[in-house]
Amino acid sequence: ITTLASYYRATLNHGNDIISLESELNIVRDYVKIALIRNPNIVKLNYDIDDSLLNLQIPKMTIQTLVENSIKYGIKAIDQPISITIKVRKLITHAEIIVEDDGIGMSTDTIDRVMKGERLEAKSGFGLKSVLNRIALINDNMSLKDIMEIQSEPNSYTRIIMRLKYK
């Protein structure tokens, strides 16, 4: 219950649409703890974070949405866990956030549709389109291809690379 309360407090905190990377990672940890209640062995979460970027300001629910998508769409089979790695690197002009999973991957057609901002299913909610729009706003409306890159191999992996300018 404590984890659920913490998650809802963080996600429903209106007025704080931009939060620190550290706060976003806490939201991700809470989300995964909640997801593990249904199936305790379904997700293995790994981190490779440059600690000097923990105060980096990012749109709330950015990484969480990508992790949620990995769990929702990437799991190969009911009893086969998915490994998700979150990497945050400091580059010269920007930070790079990478969320990678070893799930079912995406076809080239699906990647193209995502990059065009198309909804992939009728019930999809927050999703990648929202993440892209929010990152574009804080990145001086950079082009989609400058903000995000998707690499994927069907039945192998998906890697999403996001670039955020330093503010």
Put a short name on every predicted segment:
Residues 1-149, 161-163:
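Two-component histidine phosphotransfer core
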Residues 157-167:
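Short C-terminal beta-strand
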